[in-house]
Amino acid sequence: MDNETGKTFLDMARERWSVRKFTPEQISDVHMARILEAGRMAPSACNYQPQRVLVLQSDEAIARMRSVTHWAFNAPTVLLVCADLAESWKNVDGCDSAEVDAAIALDHMMMEAWECGVGSTWVRGFDERVMRQAFGIPATWKIVAMMPMGYPAESARPSIWHFKRKSNEEIYRFI
């Protein structure tokens, strides 16, 4: 189905790239609401919705984030996406869906951000213990990733790795 820009999801997936340079402008309330709604509407196992997201926007929160990892870049907003292991579906062999569910929510927010003209990148480059302590993350939450985001700087460009894609034959196996 086409969105208001007339682009399909596949168009956006092909266009989107990891933005690592941002303007200092804070994300508008309208865009932020749309991005967060996309995460809320993401599918999850048995609709348990274990995703928990810290929205870091205050100067103090961003400074704290930058003190524990340099991978926040100069983003004016960082989402710290977690999975509540106490509120997630587990299958009969104990496999917990929480991290996958939170990752799906993160991806939904990332794609909606792109639709809004907001760039982002998926980051797992941090010490979880330090991050947990810095932001008072509950013991039942697993930190899945952080998503620095903001409006792309004029000088922002995709990395050289963005254009390297495996072939269908390397990825898919029809049985």
List the predicted regions and their residue ranges.
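Acidic, surface-exposed loops and disordered segments
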Residues: 1-175
